[in-house]
A protein has these predicted regions:
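Conserved N-terminal helical subregion
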Residues: 2-8, 52-126
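Short glycine- and Lys/Arg-enriched binding-loop motifs that mark or flank ligand-binding interfaces
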Residues: 8-12, 42, 51
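Glycine-rich FAD pyrophosphate-binding loop
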Residues: 25-47
């Protein structure tokens, strides 16, 4: 059986399309992303977004290490716990997650949509 080169065209350079492009490229598949916007900054991209544990895991699987590191370092982590503070924000009570080791990959994160898009754009070479 002949082994043919596989090339995928992705229509749409939003977060989903760019994540797919990075995952395919990481798997050794040739990718081209087609986007209607002239540049990454041609229109407003919104604010910060929440990425849950499944999203963080998916991004870790799709991104090469040199892109995962900036994602992890620029995104804010959500702690698993509960705090009570005064009106001056002095902590009165802090109940943190007890037991087990926290997973550094599968965790809730908050990241700027613009920053995430720039990280994802750095991968496919588009």
């Amino acid at each position: 059986m002949k082994n043919h080169a596989f090339h995928v065209a992705i229509i749409g350079g939003g977060l989903g399309g760019l994540c797919l492009a990075n995952g395919l490229k990481k798997a050794g598949i040739s990718v081209a992303v087609y986007e209607r916007d002239q540049s990454p900054d041609s229109r407003p991209q919104g604010y910060r977004i929440h990425i849950d544990t499944q999203g963080s895991t998916a991004l870790h699987e799709c991104l090469p290490q040199h892109l995962w590191d900036p994602f992890r370092s620029t995104g804010g982590d959500f702690s698993q716990g509960f705090s009570v503070v005064t009106q001056q924000l002095h902590e009165l009570l802090n109940l943190r997650r007890i037991g087990g080791r926290e997973d550094i990959i599968a965790r809730h994160r908050s990241i700027s949509r613009i920053t995430l898009r720039r990280i994802l754009l750095a991968g496919p070479g588009t």
